[in-house]
């Protein structure tokens, strides 16, 4: 049998004009010459590669990918070429294909540091934070001083709520290079851990490097607010707005401060400037609380028509309808009292090791107090408790997730938006402990940022003058909303240790004061869609 004839490959002399055109930046000429040569040498790896480089240099990414893939069809073992294809695909927003190319690169050449990094970045952009972290860790193993990989690893660890690990990685990165953004990220992680003083220090380090860093002033203002340093926090919000008058979060944070301190006119101005998060609902709140009912009703109807799943809007709509005797036609959660759920957490009942460990960790954990204007004779933790490193807090978070499934199952037949659009994937927007002493109570409020909220009870007063001392009370009225009558329903629930009470975040709730010289400890949380 006759042997197949191997097609001739171009010589170095023949490809030299293409190389010269590329090296001198004459990309159009290089493209033209390579395209012409491919007619003569259609199976020449080197010519397809040069053609791809000429196209890529002109930002003809789609055609460049096709050219490189033809080269790889001839020789698929060239890791660098798979890497180049990955970069081009990423530029074309073809993320899955880019990830496949980077994975092929590192399988062919495990020591290719930049490929591990790019793979991590592509996975991070898709929200695949655990996989991204693994890729960044491989890049750092190969190059321990890879600053960008360390920074991004810190970010994805923070996204996964691994705050202590993220802080350690940021500290490693800062040993390599002092960077304002890294100090900012670390400050945010420290704040979420409840380490408010350390967060302030990190933010100040960021400002030393970048004195006009508006976001840092705004975030540090929030930390000082949590520490009860209200005048200083306002000064920082204003400093942020000097640096960037349009910064949404600074306008919003200043508005929240004014809102909480009773300056509703000032709050309204800054909410409307911010156009951030739930600014429209909070603007309506300001109008309602100042009895501007006509303006409120007009804005309410406009917002109801376009936003069908807002818990805060449900509070405002429901209260207005009940207050003025009109129909509540907002179907998010028109009857929130029906969705109160009182049950046990089995892991906290009886002689519970978890309960004892939680009480110990609450006593010993390095968590700073968050000032809470509605709380009387008590302290509230700062940060996000379920995101801390202590095993007991994380285990309690898992217990809550199991109860949430029971909660969903219990109300699965209901037809309102609150149930029908209950988040399939969720996160704990916040979680904290509250310790109260004699006379302790929490005034009526809602949780504006949550979908569903709850409280678990770890220690309760037993020496009561009446059965509902220390109980939680839920109602469709509270927070000193304007009231035209006294017919709003209310219900008191007396939990026992190891119980959990869950309810829509849009429902008013408060703690009834207790008189005994005992301690009441609960862990509260807000759940929101991811």
Write out the residue ranges for each language-model feature:
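Structural marker of alpha-solenoid helical repeat scaffolds
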Residues: 40, 74, 108, 142, ...
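Conserved alpha-helical positions within TPR/SEL1-like repeat arrays
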Residues: 19, 23, 46-57, 80-91, ...
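Non-heme Fe(II)/2-oxoglutarate
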Residues: 326-420, 441
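Catalytic core of non-heme Fe(II) oxygenases with the double-stranded beta-helix
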Residues: 391-394, 398-401, 405-502, 512-530
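Alpha-helical protein-protein interaction scaffolds
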Residues: 219, 225-228, 240-323
